[in-house]
Every structure is written in structure tokens, then in C-alpha cells.
Amino acid sequence: MRILKSHPLLKIVNSYIIDSPQPANLSYLWNFGSLLALCLGIQIVTGVTLAMHYTPSVSEAFNSVEHIMRDVNNGWLVRYLHSNTASAFFFLVYLHIGRGLYYGSYKTPRTLTWAIGTVILIVMMATAFLGYVLPYGQMSLWGATVITNLMSAIPWIGQDIVEFIWGGLYTDEPQCGDVLLKILLNAGKSPILGFAYDLFFIIVLLIGVKIAMTRGKSAGVRSLHTSEASQRLHAGDLTYAYLVGLFEGDGYFSITKKGKYLTYELGIELSIKDVQLIYKIKKILGIGIVSFRKINEIEMVALRIRDKNHLKSFILPIFEKYPMFSNKQYDYLRFRNALLSGIISLEDLPDYTRSDEPLNSIESIINTSYFSAWLVGFIEAEGCFSVYKLNKDDDYLIASFDIAQRDGDILISAIRKYLSFTTKVYLDKTNCSKLKVTSVRSVENIIKFLQNAPVKLLGNKKLQYLLWLKQLRKISRYSEKIKIPSNY
């Protein structure tokens, strides 16, 4: 590895092939750039070979093409390979552009790279046009006539420009008498062929510049210090505190052995109803892979982040700025220490059992500046809004809000105190600390909190909450004593 990073030539190969940062969500869409490079190589080799035998003359063009097809070894293959690769070239170019549009490659910090790509496309179109109108038959003649006639649309001077390009009143010996091209290009026997070559080498140069500028800036790979996400985090955007609360409820930190080395993963798995929430989280973070699976016939959607660079650069700063309150923080501390220590072997990983010792007191939790935003995220994960009948044969409806967490007595008690609930925390059948409220005052308190919180519910829980408010308006016990908001 030392010679790869010290040798003047090998270190270039190493930087672009081995150490080059790439998106964690790589897909087949990232193949088009390399396929275009393959097409470019084929076009150069076949184009130079054909040019050796082609005569750019109205009288000799057909004979030279027949010579290529009949007399040159595998000339027919070279010609057809050149023409079909040209079509494939543009097909792949448009797919490559589509990939860039979909993943926002035109945005900062890749704006200049995108602009160079646009120039490459324009030069490619010009090169393809010049290759198309090389003298061979009627299509070349009228192709050149029609395209160059576009200049005639320029008011007053258009027709003069067309005749200047043609070198006369009509296209003949395709612009071989064009003084302008001869002066600019000094291209030898055929200005068109020479101009095509010049443009082709311009394309190669621009592609080299574009590749150099793209290094480290591929769509989906963003520097923490330059990304919008980083700026929002350092500016104190409480959306990230919301995410910490969400991950504390339903997320996990895992270190598992898959193959020879350890895999570090931050993940969250929710019901398919929350698929939009998963994609919103991915959009906020800008990283991660979304996957789907069935568990006992229940559709689930998950977001997983496994790239170590992303974990170090994006995830750890969030959880350092907004620490979790429950004992799941022990899982994070173990995860962080192992990740930063560079442990890759299971044998080097210390044994771990989550401690039962509380990390925080009730007072320290509720006095934390970001607790309200964190609580919205935690409600998104573990909260439940419901309306039910007190008795099956009775029409008397009860509205309830409940929230629970395993081994979370201190945390749930802090939520109880923060929201001024009077109901006691209890252990349910699954050994989770649970809080359930149904009183008018408690329902009013949770509504006021959510309406005035610094962040809003984002997922399916938001729909559940809105439906809950709609049902509350129909229950006189609550609607007569609570000012139920009309929107959220």
C-alpha cells in the first residue's frame, strides 16, 4: 500500500480507484460514467482507424467506404462498431444526465462540474454533427444543408453567415473551400474531419477536467463541513434532536460480524405506514440505505447507515450534541468508542452488557434545552393516540395517550413530570415502563405541548394525531372543556 500512495503514477490510480469516496447508496445508475469512458475509447480507436482509409471527397467518399468494407481486415466491423457506439454514446449520456438530475448533481458544490458536463454535451453534439455530414451520400448532403441553414434564422445577416460557412451558394465538397475553417483549424485535406478531431480531443480534455473536479464530490458524498446538514446542525437545528428522540425509541446501534470483519450500523425499522418518514429521515441526513422486508406477514421499512465515514462524520456529531436520556446511551457510547478506535475484529471487541445504572435524573432530563424537540421524536416512535369505548355495550368514549419504554422508568417519569400528568407510571405485560392518560387535563396538556413544540410530528403519527383531534371534537367530555385546534 505504501508504493500506491508514494509513486507519482500509482497514487493517481489509488486516489481515483481505491480511496475515491463513493455514495453509500450506489446503484447501477453509477455505471453510466464508466460505460461512457468505454464508448469514448472505442470511438477514438475505431474513428482513427476509419480516418486512415476514408477520403473526404464527394467523388471518392463512396469508394473509400467500400474499400473499408471490402478490403480492410474487419473493416466492416470497425465501421459498424463506430456507428453503433456513437448511438450508444448518446443513449448513455442522457441516462447519465438523468442520474445527475435525480440525485441533484447540479447543486453546490458540484455546480461547476455540472456546467463542464453541459459543455461536454454541446461539444459532443457538434462532433456528432460533423461526423454525420462527412461526404458519403444524400443524408450527409441534406443533413449539412438543413443544420447549417439554422444560421439563416439570424435577422439581416443570417443568409450571409450560411453562405460564409458553405464557402459558396450551396454545399459542395463539404466546406473544403471554407477559408475560415482552414485558417482556424489548419486541418489538412478536410476541415470537417480536422474540426471533428479537434472537438473530439476537446471532449477528452473536458472529460478529464470533469473527472478531476468530481473526485470527492459524487452525488450522495458530502463533506460534513460544507453540507447544508452540517450548517443546520452547528446552527442548533432542533430537527436533529427530534431524530435522536426517534432513534432512542425505535432505533438501534449494532456491531456485528459479517464475514471477516465487524460491521457497524445505525438503523431504524418501522411499519410500512411510515415509509414517508423513513425517506424524510434519509433526506435530512443525506445518507443511508432504505430497505423493505416482511416480518410475520407485516411489511416493514428500514433505514440503515453502515458506511464508517458517514457514521463518523454525520452521525456521531449529532448524538454528541444531543445525547440520549435512557440507558440506550450506553449502547451508543460502546458503538462510538469501538468505531473511533478502529476495531474491525470480533476478538478485539470488549464484552458488553448494558448497565442498569441510570445516566440521568428526572430533573436533569427535563431541564435539558432540547428536551421538547427530543420528546416529539420520542412520541413519534413510542407514543399512541387512541379512542375506545369504556364498555363494549356502552357508547361512552374515552380518549387516551400512552407512551412506553423498556427499562425506562426514569425517562417515562421525566415525561410525566414535564407534561404535568398525574397518572402514575407502571410496568406493562412486556416489562415496559408505561404511562397512560385519559383525563381532560392531561389530554389538554399533550395537545398544548404538540401545538407549541419547536418541531412537528413528521410520520404516520401525525395522521394518527390529526384523526385523534377530529374524534375529540365529537366527544363532549373533551370538546366542551378543551380548545381543540383546527390544524397542526
Swiss-Prot record:
Highest taxon of source: Eukaryota
Post-translational modification: The mature protein may arise from proteolytic cleavage of an in-frame translation of cobA exon 1 plus intron, containing the I-AniI open reading frame. Cleavage may take place close to Met-213 resulting in an active endonuclease/maturase of about 30 kDa.
GO biological processes: intron homing; mRNA processing; RNA splicing
Chain segments carrying region cobA intron encoded: 170-488
Record GO terms (molecular function): endonuclease activity
Compartments where located: Mitochondrion
PROSITE patterns: CYTB_NTER
Keywords: Endonuclease, Hydrolase, Intron homing, Mitochondrion, mRNA processing, mRNA splicing, Nuclease
InterPro entries the UniProt entry points to: Cyt_b/b6_N, Cytb/b6-like_sf, Cytochrome_b_N_euk/bac, Di-haem_cyt_TM, Homing_endonucl, LAGLIDADG_dom
UniProt entry tagged with the keyword Secreted: no
cobA exon 1 encoded: annotated span: 1-169
PANTHER family: CYTOCHROME B
Assembly, per entry: Homodimer.
Family classification: In the C-terminal section; belongs to the LAGLIDADG endonuclease family.
Note: Residues 237 to 488 are sufficient for endonuclease, intron homing, and RNA maturase activity.
Protein name: Intron-encoded DNA endonuclease I-AniI
Organism encoding this protein: Emericella nidulans
Gene from which the chain derives: I-AniI
